[in-house]
């Protein structure tokens, strides 16, 4: 298959992966309305084309938390990467490192902190959930600090897991799930050889290191379900702010007031995110939520965004809507499942090229020049309500 665009990786990954793994990453919560809106709303954001601007000196470089980034993109935290490619977290981290952008290791990664951190030169970021087991949280934070992780991404939009109906149909959960997964694995030989046989161990490395025993997929599902903490509040995060002396980012913000609370709390950054449409179906897409949040806290805190970003044009759109940097999720996982480190490296090259084209044709020579003024109204059609104020006066 010829890969000429980031979207090609999704089709390739679907052919390679057992259905339980493909649909686990591809699916969303309930009827997947928000999952679809994430992509559709972003696609409706029209950019303002400008000409004759002498774009010979164009730069994608930016700085975030005193780190230089080759472009305003980071690989976000995605669980179970090591089930999508052989030691997948290591491969993805190496691709990000080579491109000059951060990699974020998930709490529920296959490869533990101690395996991924030494594989790259750049300090990685570490993502942590709010869990009932505070001992695990402290253990993970201590290990992340010892490994030199620079930034903590604290996910707060999972006090309880979302209802993901696709998982029951595909075999990730539901009746006879283990047998269904086995039958799918043996009928997908490329994955079975690369990951099933040669990608072992398949336990959840960070959890296993804490529990002192291997933690497989069934253990992971049970342990995680029992450890989400619906009682969490801002006060419960104070000990983490005191313990972690590096940048701390709160992930899962969709409301301006929550963004203001993050500023008051002392966070260094927020991620405008609905968890890729995997938590509460029917909430705002990130593209719709972002402008109001940017109006509320831009300049007071770093604003990152994810959910629905599939290519370099989407990155430029998110920056124009108010983000400082974006996180990739499904987009890089599709590429990882298709071609490992080389796939992620190629995806990042594609995104960089697409960003350069978009910036050249909108007259933005640097990331700081991608602003609300880069946006226009979609031809003859109102933008989604949350975006409409930004287009005022710029109708094409």
Curated annotation (Swiss-Prot):
SUPFAM superfamilies the record matches: FMN-linked oxidoreductases
Membrane topology: Peripheral membrane protein
Record-annotated active site: 275 (proton acceptor)
Cofactor(s) needed for function: FMN
Subcellular location, principal: membrane
GO MF, any single term: L-lactate dehydrogenase activity
EC nos: 1.1.-.-
Reactions this protein catalyses: (S)-lactate + A = pyruvate + AH2
Family that this chain belongs to: Belongs to the FMN-dependent alpha-hydroxy acid dehydrogenase family.
Protein name listed in UniProt: L-lactate dehydrogenase
């Amino acid at each position: 298959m010829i890969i000429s665009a980031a979207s090609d990786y999704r089709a390739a990954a679907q052919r390679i992966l057992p259905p339980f793994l493909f649909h686990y990453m591809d699916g969303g919560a309930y009827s997947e309305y928000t999952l679809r809106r994430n992509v559709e709303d972003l696609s409706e954001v029209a950019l303002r084309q400008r000409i004759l601007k002498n774009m010979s000196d164009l730069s994608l470089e930016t700085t975030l938390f005193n780190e230089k980034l080759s472009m305003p993109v980071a690989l976000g935290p995605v669980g179970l990467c090591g089930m999508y490619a052989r030691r997948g977290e290591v491969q993805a981290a190496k691709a990000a490192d080579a491109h000059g952008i951060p990699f974020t290791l998930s709490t529920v990664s296959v490869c533990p902190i101690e395996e991924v951190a030494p594989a790259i030169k750049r300090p990685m970021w570490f993502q942590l959930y709010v869990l009932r087991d505070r001992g695990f949280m402290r253990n993970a934070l201590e290990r992340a600090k010892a490994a030199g992780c620079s930034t903590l991404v604290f996910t707060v939009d999972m006090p309880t897991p979302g209802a993901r109906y696709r998982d029951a149909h595909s075999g990730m959960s539901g009746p006879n799930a283990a047998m269904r997964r086995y039958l799918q694995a043996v009928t997908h030989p490329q994955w079975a050889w690369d990951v099933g046989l040669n990608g072992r161990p398949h336990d959840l490395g960070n959890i296993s290191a804490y529990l002192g025993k291997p933690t497989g997929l069934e253990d992971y599902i049970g342990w995680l379900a029992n450890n989400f903490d619906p009682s969490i509040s801002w006060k419960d995060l104070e000990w983490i702010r005191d313990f972690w002396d590096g940048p701390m980012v709160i992930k899962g913000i969709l409301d301006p007031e929550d963004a203001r609370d993050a500023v008051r709390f002392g966070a260094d950054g927020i991620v405008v995110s609905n968890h890729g449409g995997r938590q509460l179906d029917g909430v705002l897409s990130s593209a719709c939520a972002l402008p109001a949040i940017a109006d509320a806290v831009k300049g007071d805190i770093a604003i990152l965004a994810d959910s629905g970003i599939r290519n370099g044009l989407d990155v430029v759109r998110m920056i124009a809507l108010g983000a400082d940097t974006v996180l990739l999720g499904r987009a890089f996982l599709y590429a990882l499942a298709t071609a490992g480190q080389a796939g992620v490296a190629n995806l990042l090259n594609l995104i960089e090229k697409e960003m350069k084209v978009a910036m050249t044709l909108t007259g933005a020579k640097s990331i700081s020049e991608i602003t609300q003024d880069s946006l226009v109204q979609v031809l003859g059609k109102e933008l989604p309500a949350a975006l409409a104020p930004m287009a005022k006066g710029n109708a094409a």
